Amino acid sequence: MAVKIRLRRMGQKKAPFYRIVVADSRSPRDGRCIEEIGTYDPTKDPSEYHVNEELAKKWLSNGAQPTETVARIFKSAGIEK
């Protein structure tokens, strides 16, 4: 099973916020996830995010691949493999 760390869209139309989730790469964007590890709100200025660093590091060490956007969020949060 290929595991990805990616964003799950939440919120209303034209007012999105995202949850950072660990999910199977074959599941749909807003489908079933394995675990939620944070949130990201791009509508605020500046963008706001909260990440559980312990869970993020655990999943990265287990081989989960972050998407480009999540990798950028992790980099600004100081989370690396």
UniProtKB/Swiss-Prot annotation:
Keywords: Ribonucleoprotein, Ribosomal protein. One of its GO terms (biological process) is translation. One of its GO terms (cellular component) is small ribosomal subunit. GO terms for molecular function: structural constituent of ribosome. NCBIfam families: S16. Belongs to the bacterial ribosomal protein bS16 family. PANTHER family: 30S RIBOSOMAL PROTEIN S16 (PTHR12919), SMALL RIBOSOMAL SUBUNIT PROTEIN BS16M (PTHR12919:SF20). This is Small ribosomal subunit protein bS16.
